[in-house]
Amino acid sequence: NLDPENAIFINAYFPHRLMSLADELNSKLIHISTDCVFSGTKEMPYIEKDFKDGKDAYAKSKGLGEIINKNHLTLRTSVIGPELKRDGEELFHWFMSQTGQVNGFTQAIWSGVTTLILAKVVDWAIEHEITGLYHVTNNNSIDKYSLLCLIKKYTKKNISIIPVEDKKPNKSFIDTRNELDFIIPSYEVMIRKMIDMMLQNKEIYEQYESNSARK
């Protein structure tokens, strides 16, 4: 949102350029989009055909960049997971870098998946004839307070999470196509398996070791 011109180029123009290159190579493009294409004002979870009513430059540019046709695939979701860069900025990295206590918003609703699950879905999509638009979710939702509590539980991080009832946009979404041949697990299972994966690959995620009680 700080650089709308750059956002339009990267989020809106570039995916379509990639699509053209994929067409030339007779290949399928798998593009990742976001729940931020929605404003969060709908009273029920968003489905694939809902109007993309996000208002800011990021939302509009991501919406324009979605590739929805019979040859390519857009996976619309939201993700949480560890980052390779030390100055990460997403929720998991932010939480793991905090000390003392943090706020957890009980009315900030989330329907996404871990980066580990998204990788599994992408791997599956490469091998299967699935195209168009697909919502990657377990068709449930969780509030950000409960999500942080799960991360605390499985990392054994010494931190207090204060529940805060602050009204937030509800961008929850569901998958109405149901074409995956495996079940996306519960949030507790997703977080547990993600932390297990990190412990099995400590050399990659060593930046998080000092912020976790699990070694």
Residue ranges: model-predicted function:
Residues V121-F173, K202-K215:
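Mid/C-terminal beta-alpha module of Rossmann-like enzyme folds, strongest
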Residues K55, I67-G112, L116-I117, D123-W124:
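NAD(P)-dependent short-chain dehydrogenase/reductase
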Residues P15-H16, G63-I67, K120:
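Conserved active-site helix of classical SDR/Rossmann-fold NAD(P)-dependent CH-OH oxidoreductases
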Residues I30-S33, L73-T74, S111, H135:
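Structural signature of the Rossmann-like NAD(P)-dependent dehydrogenase/reductase core
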Residues H16-D53:
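Conserved Rossmann-fold NAD(P)-dependent oxidoreductase catalytic core, especially the SDR/UDP-sugar
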Residues P4, T34, T77, N138:
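Short acidic donor-binding/metal-coordinating loop in glycosyltransferase active sites
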Residues N1-A12:
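NAD(P)H-binding glycine-rich loop region in Rossmannoid oxidoreductase-like domains
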Residues N11, Y58-K62, R76:
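Active-site YXXXK catalytic motif of short-chain dehydrogenase/reductase
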